[in-house]
Every structure is written in C-alpha cells, then in structure tokens.
Amino acid sequence: MKQLDFNSIYKNDSQQSTGLLFIRAYHKWHELIKSQLKTIDLTHPQFVVLTTLAALLRQQEWVSQTDIARFSDMDVMTVSQIIRLLVKKGLIMREVHPKDSRANIILLTEQGLQKVNQALPLVEGIDQAFFGKLEDKTEILNQLLIELETAND
C-alpha cells in the first residue's frame, strides 16, 4: 500500500494527540450518557437545560433563557428550541417576568423536578463509574479541566 504524506505532528503515533484521546474518551462517556437518558425520554441537551435551570433556581429567584445559555455554555437559539420542547413535554413553563413584562422567566414544573431527580442519579452514576476508573486521579483531571477551561475563555 502506498504511504501517504500525512501532514500531522502525530502521524507516527496518534496516541500522542491529546485532542484525539480527549474526543475518544468523550465519545465513550457521551454514548453511556445518551443511552441512559434515552430510557427516561430525555436527550443530553435536554438534561443539561433542565439541570442548569434547577441549579440556577437554587441560586436566584428568576431564571431567563439567557441565564441558562450562559451557565451551560450553550447557544441561545439552541436553548430556546430545547425550552420549547420541554414546555411541550410539561417539564418546564414560561411566565412573564414579574418586574419586566417584556421578558420571560423559566420555571420547573413538578414533573420537571421529578425528571431532574430521576436523571441525576443516572448521569452521576455514569460519571462515578466512568471517571472512577481513574481512582485517585479524578481530582487531578477535574483541576486540569478547570485550568483548560479558564485558560481558554
């Protein structure tokens, strides 16, 4: 077979590519997450929006679509589409902001809170099993991920 002139600094050893290793590990983790969330009729982005909303409601009285997008680092339009779907599912609701009639606030319904409480143990269980294989290195991984995120803001 003809040898290709592959213009990569990792052409002789793909195991040296941090990006490739990261994306492979991410895909394995993400497949587990998607599979478990599917059993309770949620997608991963829906889970992120629901849990972000729940977390923000613990910290502040009113939560907007923009708050959810900012906190979850998701595109505002994507969050808007997900919110529309979650409203149809009866998991969240929109209300007019009590202090600004031009704005909406997003609230969890009782059914939405139940769904969050059903989903969290599934996702956290996957996290514990998947990242637990690192044993005592999980905290180091977390610190490195925080450092990467902060350095690339």
Protein language model features and the residues they cover:
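Charged, amphipathic alpha-helical coiled-coil/dimerization segments
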Residues: 4, 84-143
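N-terminal leader segment of winged-helix/HTH proteins
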Residues: 1-40
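Pre-recognition alpha-helix immediately N-terminal to the DNA-recognition helix
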Residues: 21, 48-52, 114
